[in-house]
Protein backbone atom coordinates (compact mmCIF):
# COMPACT_ATOMS: atom_id res chain seq x y z
CA UNK A 1 0.00 0.00 0.00
CA UNK A 2 1.41 3.34 -1.03
CA UNK A 3 1.61 6.16 1.50
CA UNK A 4 1.29 8.62 -1.35
CA UNK A 5 -2.44 8.19 -1.91
CA UNK A 6 -4.10 11.17 -3.55
CA UNK A 7 -7.50 12.21 -2.25
CA UNK A 8 -10.00 13.27 -4.87
CA UNK A 9 -12.36 15.98 -3.69
CA UNK A 10 -15.88 15.55 -5.00
CA UNK A 11 -17.48 18.71 -3.71
CA UNK A 12 -16.78 22.12 -2.19
CA UNK A 13 -18.92 23.29 0.74
CA UNK A 14 -19.60 26.95 1.55
CA UNK A 15 -21.18 27.68 4.95
CA UNK A 16 -22.15 31.17 6.12
CA UNK A 17 -23.91 32.27 9.32
CA UNK A 18 -25.37 35.70 10.00
CA UNK A 19 -26.54 37.69 13.01
CA UNK A 20 -29.03 40.36 12.05
CA UNK A 21 -29.67 43.70 13.73
CA UNK A 22 -33.08 43.78 15.39
CA UNK A 23 -35.13 46.57 13.82
CA UNK A 24 -32.74 47.23 10.91
CA UNK A 25 -34.74 48.58 7.97
CA UNK A 26 -37.86 48.24 10.13
CA UNK A 27 -37.70 44.43 10.29
CA UNK A 28 -37.13 41.89 13.04
CA UNK A 29 -34.24 39.42 12.98
CA UNK A 30 -36.78 36.70 12.12
CA UNK A 31 -38.10 38.70 9.16
CA UNK A 32 -34.57 39.23 7.85
CA UNK A 33 -33.80 35.52 8.23
CA UNK A 34 -36.96 34.50 6.38
CA UNK A 35 -36.23 36.98 3.55
CA UNK A 36 -32.70 35.62 3.22
CA UNK A 37 -33.98 32.03 3.19
CA UNK A 38 -36.55 32.76 0.47
CA UNK A 39 -34.21 34.73 -1.78
CA UNK A 40 -31.07 32.61 -1.45
CA UNK A 41 -32.98 29.36 -1.99
CA UNK A 42 -34.56 30.94 -5.09
CA UNK A 43 -31.06 31.05 -6.64
CA UNK A 44 -31.16 27.26 -7.16
CA UNK A 45 -31.79 26.74 -10.86
CA UNK A 46 -30.83 30.35 -11.61
CA UNK A 47 -27.13 30.16 -10.74
CA UNK A 48 -25.88 27.05 -12.58
CA UNK A 49 -22.88 26.49 -10.28
CA UNK A 50 -25.06 25.66 -7.26
CA UNK A 51 -25.17 21.89 -6.61
CA UNK A 52 -27.20 22.25 -3.42
CA UNK A 53 -28.25 25.12 -1.20
CA UNK A 54 -30.34 25.45 1.91
CA UNK A 55 -30.87 28.20 4.44
CA UNK A 56 -31.79 27.41 8.02
CA UNK A 57 -33.55 29.92 10.27
CA UNK A 58 -32.44 29.71 13.89
CA UNK A 59 -34.88 28.36 16.47
CA UNK A 60 -32.46 28.50 19.42
CA UNK A 61 -32.90 31.26 22.00
CA UNK A 62 -29.27 31.23 23.16
CA UNK A 63 -27.68 34.67 23.04
CA UNK A 64 -24.68 33.29 21.18
CA UNK A 65 -26.74 31.83 18.33
CA UNK A 66 -26.69 33.13 14.76
CA UNK A 67 -30.02 34.01 13.13
CA UNK A 68 -29.58 32.19 9.80
CA UNK A 69 -27.16 29.74 8.21
CA UNK A 70 -26.45 29.00 4.55
CA UNK A 71 -25.18 25.52 3.64
CA UNK A 72 -24.26 25.30 -0.04
CA UNK A 73 -22.27 22.97 -2.26
CA UNK A 74 -20.37 23.50 -5.51
CA UNK A 75 -18.14 21.36 -7.71
CA UNK A 76 -15.05 23.30 -6.57
CA UNK A 77 -13.84 26.65 -5.20
CA UNK A 78 -13.82 28.18 -8.69
CA UNK A 79 -17.52 27.36 -9.08
CA UNK A 80 -18.22 29.08 -5.76
CA UNK A 81 -16.34 32.18 -6.92
CA UNK A 82 -18.48 32.27 -10.08
CA UNK A 83 -21.60 31.99 -7.88
CA UNK A 84 -20.45 34.96 -5.79
CA UNK A 85 -20.26 37.25 -8.83
CA UNK A 86 -23.37 35.96 -10.61
CA UNK A 87 -25.78 38.94 -11.00
CA UNK A 88 -28.63 37.13 -9.21
CA UNK A 89 -26.41 36.44 -6.18
CA UNK A 90 -24.99 39.97 -6.20
CA UNK A 91 -28.56 41.31 -6.07
CA UNK A 92 -29.43 39.16 -3.03
CA UNK A 93 -26.10 39.94 -1.33
CA UNK A 94 -26.85 43.68 -1.50
CA UNK A 95 -29.69 43.08 1.00
CA UNK A 96 -27.16 42.36 3.76
CA UNK A 97 -25.71 45.89 3.82
CA UNK A 98 -26.61 47.55 7.10
CA UNK A 99 -28.62 44.69 8.60
CA UNK A 100 -25.91 42.37 9.98
CA UNK A 101 -23.99 42.61 13.21
CA UNK A 102 -22.05 39.38 12.72
CA UNK A 103 -21.01 36.96 10.02
CA UNK A 104 -19.02 33.72 10.08
CA UNK A 105 -17.91 31.66 7.09
CA UNK A 106 -16.26 28.29 6.48
CA UNK A 107 -15.31 26.73 3.15
CA UNK A 108 -13.97 23.20 2.74
CA UNK A 109 -13.53 20.29 0.34
CA UNK A 110 -15.19 16.92 0.83
Map each language-model feature to its residues.
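C-terminal structural segments of small proteins and small subunits
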Residues: 74-99
Amino acid sequence: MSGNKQIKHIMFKHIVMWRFIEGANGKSKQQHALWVKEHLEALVGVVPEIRSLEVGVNVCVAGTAYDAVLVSAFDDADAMERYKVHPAHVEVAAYFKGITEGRAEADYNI
